[in-house]
């Protein structure tokens, strides 16, 4: 693998809470650059204008900084190849799109969303994978000009070779061959003029002189589109490396439904960043048992990108807890430990919000742990007996928990008002009084039938923690139902 003049990047999309999977890919790129004396840069890929927000961008940057990752160039510090935010680069992409049209490598497509959906439904009914059928390929230049002048909306799609295969070597998967007839005529420029991921990704990587592209294995099937774009533009392509996805213990894809996936979840609960990076870094190295405790420099020394496994990296929270405990006990001096605790407490938004709610509800400071301690716990240790005191039967409690969990995911802005509104709506849909619905939620969220106000507590804890606690509560109640 060629490694001279290495430049790698992490390119997160600011469409939600920063994911541990982003930290996983970022760490690989960071270690790769560090190992080869190269440069690690950060680019924000916000071409999804409907879901990308400045707030999520800030959270992503803050989360990666908390992880201890430092980039040489990025939207927050600038650099010679900026802007480093794709929405700020929109004018850059248009000439390249026109170049593809002029060279006959792309075409305008006027198919409506309704027509495309009908096409996909017909393909699925015939047992075929959905992909564009090429209807607009036959349009003449005059027809395209006329329809465009009439104000008809269009996108720009790339042309795909009609036969043969795309053969390439991946840094992890080795030699790969993908038939061209399985590759879709990808949209490159959307109707609003914004590029899709595929178009912007290739252009930005070239202009930013990226030499190695390391990303999740879910992008492996997209490599033919990217290689084709490099060929169409006459550019040298980077080395591709597709990393195995992180998985749950049952080998399923890591998801927020089974494990907390937000970096902020681990930060707020008192995990230390060195331990999280240590844990993620173990997926990229080979060590003997007993050698697991490693600093970033030690991870870099042992890092070997030529011996990566295609097997899924198992995200074992128990192992993370074990490593975090070892870091606290073995790597931090007493003074540093105290400083970390104080800094964590002072910067902990949950604690601050909990103190504000608690001030009017206590008569002694010593009452705080019982009243608000649940805000800082990683595990409430819920037992089936904790729900036995609720008047509703276990079957009804389980129904409530199983209904509330997915419905809360519909909330776009997670705050007191939206949580209350959704829970009231759930109560109406279930035909139950609000008190009946929220009673088990008090126990699920705080571990007690009486605590700080429920809606405030849920807002303070955040979506990831509430999701996890409701899941564990449902498991506890299911055991109660099974015992009857």
From Swiss-Prot:
A GO cellular component entry from the record: cytosol
Binding annotation for ATP: 256
E.C. no: 6.1.1.17
Keyword annotations: Aminoacyl-tRNA synthetase, ATP-binding, Cytoplasm, Ligase, Nucleotide-binding, Protein biosynthesis
Predominant cellular place of this UniProt entry's protein: cytoplasm
Root EC class: ligase
Subcellular location: Cytoplasm
Pfam assignment, any one: Anticodon_2
GO molecular function ontology, one term from the record: ATP binding
Xref: Gene3D superfamilies: 1.10.10.350, HUPs (3.40.50.620)
Catalysed transformations (reactions): tRNA(Glu) + L-glutamate + ATP = L-glutamyl-tRNA(Glu) + AMP + diphosphate
Motif 'KMSKS' region per UniProt: ranges: 253-257
Entry's Gene Ontology BP terms: glutamyl-tRNA aminoacylation
Residues spanned by motif 'HIGH' region: 12-22
Stored InterPro entries: aa-tRNA-synth_I_cd-bd, aa-tRNA-synth_I_codon-bd_sub2, aa-tRNA-synth_I_CS, aa_tRNA-synth_I_cd-bd_sf, Glu-tRNA-ligase_bac/mito, Glu/Gln-tRNA-synth, Glu/Gln-tRNA-synth_Ib_cat-dom, GluQ/Sye
Superkingdom in the source lineage: Bacteria
Primary role: Catalyzes the attachment of glutamate to tRNA(Glu) in a two-step reaction: glutamate is first activated by ATP to form Glu-AMP and then transferred to the acceptor end of tRNA(Glu).
Family of this protein: Belongs to the class-I aminoacyl-tRNA synthetase family. Glutamate--tRNA ligase type 1 subfamily.
NCBIfam families linked: gltX_bact
The protein's assembly and partners: Monomer.
The protein's name: Glutamate--tRNA ligase
Organism: Rhizobium etli (strain CIAT 652)
Gene: gltX
